[in-house]
Amino acid sequence: MATFSQKPAEVEKKWVIIDAEGLVVGRLASIIAMRLRGKHKATFTPHVDDGDNVIVINADKVVFTGKKYSDKVYYWHTGYAGGIKERTARQIIEGRFPERVLEKAVERMVPRGPLGRRQMKNLRVYAGPNHPHEAQQPVALDVAALNKKNVRSA
């Protein structure tokens, strides 16, 4: 029997919605990255974008474990000499675009390159509880029920 290889025309993409309230960032990002790549399917093929479309709501209510909320630092460079910039996770979550923390975590778990960029376009992250994708009839995925460590206990 020959090895199965998914053809791009045969791909069936589902829509999944995840409520990120109270979930641990890294664990949630790992599950989202797996869904975006399609590794949860038996038909996974490394060179084909056969992952699902993922909608994440309440991304501003994700949590970190330990002291990462105040100590984790995100760096970027402007391109100018001496242009290194930094922000803590707390500054980003309390700032204008709190969903970027989760977007960056997922982006860094998806392979870099043309396929990874295409798969990242299937991710939609919203800071609040509202999203404009009701017409797609997304299926809810309860990440908290998958493992008790996915939710931070006080």
From Swiss-Prot:
Keywords assigned by UniProt, alphabetized: Ribonucleoprotein, Ribosomal protein
Annotated InterPro entries: Ribosomal_uL13 (IPR005822), Ribosomal_uL13_bac-type (IPR005823), Ribosomal_uL13_sf (IPR036899)
Gene Ontology CC terms: cytosolic large ribosomal subunit
GO molecular function, one term: structural constituent of ribosome
GO terms for biological process, alphabetical: negative regulation of translation; translation
Disulfide bonds: none
Pfam families named in the record: Ribosomal_L13 (PF00572)
Function: This protein is one of the early assembly proteins of the 50S ribosomal subunit, although it is not seen to bind rRNA by itself. It is important during the early stages of 50S assembly.
Subunit details: Part of the 50S ribosomal subunit.
HAMAP family in the record: Ribosomal_uL13 (MF_01366)
Family statement: Belongs to the universal ribosomal protein uL13 family.
Record protein name field: Large ribosomal subunit protein uL13
Gene name tied to this protein: rplM
